[in-house]
From Swiss-Prot:
Transcription factor that play a central role in proper axial mesendoderm morphogenesis and endoderm formation. Required for efficient differentiation of cells from the primitive streak stage to blood, by acting early in the recruitment and/or expansion of mesodermal progenitors to the hemangioblastic and hematopoietic lineages. Also involved in the morphogenesis of the heart and the gut during embryogenesis. Acts as a negative regulator of brachyury expression. Residues 86-145 bind DNA. It comes from Mus musculus (Mouse). SMART domains: HOX. Its main location: nucleus. It comes from the Eukaryota. This is Homeobox protein MIXL1. Induction: By TGF-beta. Regulated by Nodal in mesendoderm morphogenesis. Regulated by FOXH1, which acts as a negative regulator by recruiting GSC to promoter during early development. Residues 23-93 are annotated as: Disordered. PANTHER family: HOMEOBOX PROTEIN MIXL, HOMEOBOX PROTEIN MIXL1. Signal peptide: none annotated. Keywords: Developmental protein, Differentiation, DNA-binding, Homeobox, Nucleus, Transcription, Transcription regulation. The gene is Mixl1.
């Protein structure tokens, strides 16, 4: 039994890993062929690139082909990520600029492009910033009154002179004349020579509010030109 088991084991090993030595037709075994050290190496097969040229759309590298249904790989860590849209810097208005804008807003809440450009020249602010200020001011007025704010006068003929060339770059903050009257504009519903009290002070109303605004703008403009002449 032991001999039969060993024969079966040898037969199984021989069946699993058969060894067939190379033989000459005459029955003699030939030695293994080894390349001579003095002979040059076999040239590269030139037919290999031809097979690739037949299929130009195929790439030999396996990484170039992306499986269907998968997204392409994301950017590497070294590449900079797209920057988020930056928020516009908020413009700060001086007290003189706000007084002039409020003065014009009390006359007309929808200034045209020409009036906005002249305001920009006087306040040294961009015209786009002045337009945004009037939009925000109208929204604030609607929230306070609960209805659309009506302008006190339909007259838009406020004449604002543009400053001389080369003076726009100078940032001036002159004191607005008659600044007390700007914060206490008389009530348009009052007629005649009524008064508008605020605290312990009282101010006489003017016959025409639009003319008063125009005179204040002229005084403010003259004050700017006088300040420019001191330089």
């Amino acid at each position: 039994m032991a001999a039969a088991g060993s024969q079966q084991l040898q037969f199984a090993e021989g069946a699993a890993f058969p060894i067939f030595p190379a033989a000459h037709p005459g029955g003699q075994l030939l030695p293994a062929m080894r390349p001579a050290s003095g002979l040059p190496a076999a040239p590269h097969d030139s037919r290999a690139p031809a097979a690739t040229q037949c299929f130009p759309n195929r790439d030999s590298s396996p990484t170039a082909q992306t499986p269907a249904g998968l997204d392409p790989p994301g950017p590497s860590k070294g590449s900079a990520a797209p920057s988020a849209p930056q928020r516009r810097k908020r413009t700060s208005f001086s007290s003189e600029q706000l007084q002039l804008l409020e003065l014009v807003f009390r006359q007309t809440m929808y200034p045209d492009i020409h009036l906005r450009e002249r305001l920009a020249a006087l306040t040294l602010l961009p015209e786009s910033r002045i337009q945004v200020w009037f939009q925000n001011r109208r929204a604030k007025s609607r929230r306070q009154s609960g209805k659309s704010f009506q302008p006190l006068s339909s007259r838009r003929g406020v004449f604002l002179h543009c400053p001389a060339p080369g003076t726009e770059a100078r940032c001036l903050k002159p004191q607005l004349p008659l600044e007390a009257d700007v914060n206490h504009v008389p009530d348009p519903s009052m007629t005649g020579g009524g008064v508008c009290t605020s605290g312990s002070q009282s101010f006489e109303t003017y016959s025409s509010l639009s003319e008063d605004i125009g005179s204040k703008l002229d005084s403010w403009e003259e004050h700017i030109f006088s300040a420019l002449g001191n330089f």
